[in-house]
């Protein structure tokens, strides 16, 4: 049996051993576009090199600061050394941000600047400077839920609850917040998921 990685590996072997086949495919793809290039591994990069060999028209989009999949084989080196592997590379930096305030961008830039192995960029916006960014830390998820709910209680004197949001990395992280909100009677809704106690596996318990 073959998994997805094996399929690409066997394709690369075929292209490397058979010049005629390699020529057909590299000539067939006049332009190659790749997204999330920072997440490619060694064999995927090799495959792209073979496909782009004749026309050398390849456009790769990615963000070195979002390279989080090294644990599954992603090679940030593919991204960092792209201009060395392809002649006449033109690098276009997408640094203008349309979503966040400048204060958020400045904090994010300061944190990520500590990363090693990055091209580097300066994020900016034409929008407002925005509110200051505050950082609170908690010992447990329960403590965090209490702290956040206390802040919401203060904020709701100035803002409507539907203008206040909590962003989480994964849906399982909502549980502590939901339990806290249910306890104090604070209304809430989950966007992009299902409330913890309404999930089928929880109802079945």
Question: What residue ranges belong to the model's regions?
Answer:
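Helicase P-loop NTPase motor core
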Residues: 87-90, 95-188
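Well-ordered alpha-helical segments embedded in enzymatic catalytic cores
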Residues: 10, 47, 78, 144-154, ...
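Short runs of predominantly hydrophobic/aromatic residues within well-ordered alpha helices
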Residues: 4, 8, 44, 145, ...
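Short, glycine/charged-enriched secondary-structure capping and boundary segments
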Residues: 46-49, 73-77, 107-108, 179-183, ...
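Conserved helicase NTPase motor core
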Residues: 1-81, 96-100
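Conserved short internal alpha-helix adjacent to the catalytic or cofactor-binding core
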Residues: 131, 182-186, 194-205
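Short, acidic/turn-prone active-site loops that include or flank metal/cofactor-
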Residues: 64-65, 192-196
